[in-house]
Amino acid sequence: MIGDFVDEVNIKVIAGKGGDGAVSFRREKFVEKGGPDGGDGGDGGSIIIKSTLNKNTLVDFKYKKIFRAENGENGKNKNKAGKAGEDVLIEVPVGTCIYDLETNELLSDLKAPQQYLVVARGGKGGRGNARFATSTLQVPRIAEKGVEGEVKNLKLILKIVADVGLIGYPNVGKSTLISRISNAKVEIADYPFTTIVPNLGVVKVDTDYSFVVADIPGLIEGAHLGKGLGDQFLRHIERCSVLVHLIDISCFERDDPVEDYINIRKELESFSHILLKKKEIIVANKIDAVDKDTLEKRLTDFKNRTGKDIFPISAYTGENIQELITMVWSHISKEKIEQQKFFQKRLKSNVTEKIKIQPVNYEPDPFIKINVVKLDNETFEVVGDGIEKLLSRYDIHQKDSRLLILNTLEKNGLNKILRNAGVKEGDTVYIGNFSFEYIP
C-alpha cells in the first residue's frame, strides 16, 4: 500500500542567476592600470526533474514546494571565472506529468525511469572587462551583469504506471485479490472504502518476468463527478493495458451484478472514452459464497444480458487464481517484455550526467524602441522593454558601461526623440536609476 498517498501538487522552481563579470586590472610594469583581467561570472544553476522507480507518491512536495538553484559566482581578477551554480535535481515517481501552471501546457510525461526535463534554466554569467578590451578601448571599465535564471510555477500530476488495473464497486474483493496474487500488503475489511488510496502489487509470472497491478479504490455511480472517492483515482487506470473488472457474484451486499457492471462502465466512459477501449477481463469473485447451481444461473444471466464472458474465481480460497494470472499475462506479455528490456537499459545509464544545459542568455538588441515619459515640467524618463534589458546587463554607474548604453540609445535616435518629447536644455532625464542634465 502507498502510505501517505499524494498524486497532485504545485511547486515553484527558481533557477540561479548568472554571476556578474569582474572589472579588474593586472599589475604590469609600463602598462596603464596593468591591463584588464576581469573574469567572467559563472552560469546559474538549473533545475531538473527526473523520474525514478524509488518513489511512488508525490508526498515529499507537501512539505517542500519551492526549489532554488545556486547563483553563479561573480568573476574574479587574474581572468578567473566564477564557479557555476549547482544544479538541483528533483526526483519524482515514474508516471509523473509536468504541467506549466500558468498555461496548463503539458511539458513532459515521464513514463519511464531515468527520463528528465530541465524545467528552469540558469542564467548566463556576465563577461568580465577582459572581454571588452579593443585597440581603442584598452582600459575598459565595463563588465556584464549575469542573466536572471528562469522562474516557473509547475503542477505535478502522478498517474500510476501499472500494467493491470483492478476496478469495481467497493467491497467486491479487489484488496483480497491483489494480496492473493502479488506481494502487496493491504488492509482488508468487510466494509466499503476500506481502500482509500491505490494499492500496488507486483505479480511474478516466472523468474524473469512480472507485471504491476493497481487496486483502484472502489468506484460508485457519480464517481466522475466527485462522488464517493470521486474521480481523483480514475486517472490512475489511464495507463493500464488491461482492466480486470471485479463483480461480486455472491449478491450478498448488492442485488444485481449486471447493473453494477453497467454502472461502472458508464463511469469510465464519463471520465474518458479511452478507458472503454482498453482490454477488459470481467471476473466474478466470491464464488465460494454461493452454491454451484446458483453460480451457474448467475453466470449465465450475466452472459445473456451483457453478451460478455465472465471468469469465476474466489480471491478468498484461491480458486482459479493462477488461471486468471495466466489469462492476464497472455494479453500483456509482448508489450511488457519489451518494456522491461527498455527499462533495464535505461537503468544501466545515468542520463543526468550527460545533460548539457544551455543557460538563459540575453544579447541586447541593437534596435531599441524608445519612449519618453514626462514626470513633471522639467523631468523626463526614458523607458522601454529594450532599455530595461540593456540596463539588466550593464551597470550604468560604470563610466564605460554608461557610454555603451548611451551610444546604443543614440544610435536609435535618443536625442531626436527627447527633443520631440519637449525636453529642453537643463531638464533632468532619467534612464533607470541614473539621471543626467540634458544638453542638446
Swiss-Prot record:
Keywords: Cytoplasm, GTP-binding, Hydrolase, Magnesium, Metal-binding, Nucleotide-binding. GTP binds at residues 168-175, 193-197, 215-218, 285-288, 314-316. One of its GO terms (molecular function) is GTPase activity. Residues 162-333 form the OBG-type G domain. Disulfide bonds: none annotated. Its EC number is 3.6.5.-. One of its GO terms (cellular component) is cytoplasm. GO terms for biological process: ribosome biogenesis. It is found in: Cytoplasm. Coiled coil: none annotated. InterPro entries: G_OBG, GTP-bd, GTP-bd_Obg/CgtA, GTP-bd_prot_GTP1/OBG_C_sf, GTP1-OBG_CS, GTP1_OBG_dom, GTP1_OBG_dom_sf, OBG_GTPase. It holds the Pfam family MMR_HSR1. Mg(2+) binds at S175, T195. Gene3D superfamilies: GTP-binding protein OBG, C-terminal domain, GTP1/OBG domain, P-loop containing nucleotide triphosphate hydrolases. Residues 3-161 form the Obg domain. Its cofactor is Mg(2+). Residues 359-440 form the OCT domain. Monomer. Belongs to the TRAFAC class OBG-HflX-like GTPase superfamily. OBG GTPase family. An essential GTPase which binds GTP, GDP and possibly (p)ppGpp with moderate affinity, with high nucleotide exchange rates and a fairly low GTP hydrolysis rate. Plays a role in control of the cell cycle, stress response, ribosome biogenesis and in those bacteria that undergo differentiation, in morphogenesis control. This is GTPase Obg.
